[in-house]
């Protein structure tokens, strides 16, 4: 009986020893698995930290990119507005250039017309001056003739009948010469009025020509400025 009891106890001991070894093995495996899991957790935490850092970096870069995009959009709108303003300014300058060209062409026409009128008036003035000189010479000639007749009347000693007859003749001659003198004086006066009128017309045309020249110069200066502004764009 004692031997049988010992065997039973020994079997139980062996069984317990086996179970203990299995338990220790299981515990050791569990510890190893725990350590492995801890390492995996640590790696995952480190990877998460790196992921969070990358996420933070990506978020910051995204914010910077968003700000850059906003700034780029603002710059684009500014450039677009500047471009629109430049196009509008160019259109205005082109219209001003067209108007200035038309004004310059009109000024050229007026300048040519004024120069032509001035040339014609100068010719008329020369002719009038020539007529005035001729009329004045004729007046002097008639005055000399009248003086000669008067002197001859005083120096002649003739009979009363002859004197009377010649007096009538002389009176007729004097009347004729007086009338011719009056006509010549009238023509001279008319010629003087014509010359004065033509001189006023010449003065007016010269003033008009000067004004057209000044206006033409102003238009030319404006054209030069417009071309310079267009060249700047």
UniProtKB/Swiss-Prot annotation:
Tell me if Transcription regulation is a UniProt keyword of this record.
no
Q: Does the keyword Coiled coil apply?
A: yes
Basic and acidic residues bias locations: 51-79
Q: Which organism is it from?
A: Magallana gigas
Q: What is known of its domains?
A: The molecule is in a coiled coil structure that is formed by 2 polypeptide chains. The sequence exhibits a prominent seven-residues periodicity.
Q: How does it assemble?
A: Homodimer.
Coiled-coil intervals, chain numbering: 6-222
Q: Which family does it belong to?
A: Belongs to the tropomyosin family.
Q: Which domain of life is it from?
A: Eukaryota
Show which residues constitute the signal peptide: none
Q: What are the disulfide bonds?
A: none
Q: What is this protein called?
A: Tropomyosin
| Keyword terms | Allergen, Coiled coil, Muscle protein, Repeat
Chain positions covered by the region annotation Disordered? 48-88
What PANTHER family does its record include?
Answer: TROPOMYOSIN
Question: Function of this protein?
Answer: Tropomyosin, in association with the troponin complex, plays a central role in the calcium dependent regulation of muscle contraction.
* GO MF annotation terms: protein homodimerization activity
